[in-house]
Amino acid sequence: IETPNGKTVELSDEAGAIRIEDEHGNKILLDSSGVTIESASDLNLKSGKDAKVTAGANLDLEAAAQLAVSASASLEVSASGTTTIKGALVQIN
């Protein structure tokens, strides 16, 4: 299905995939490898209450420039194994 403005929804039994794409280059792909969400610009996830990300094995967060983590109340970082903090300069408090 494709609209005149370039929005596409593709259901493929042959490829076993569902692909949704808009004219701005934003894409959602569901296939046997998983779910891929791709944004040509910003990607925002917003929840009116709690949000949770759970991975069965590893979870990687990577930013080309800066990564900021903040909380208005408390923040906890914990691991049952070794915790490593690396940086050219590490400042605590």
Model-identified regions with their sequence ranges:
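Right-handed beta-helix
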Residues: 1-93
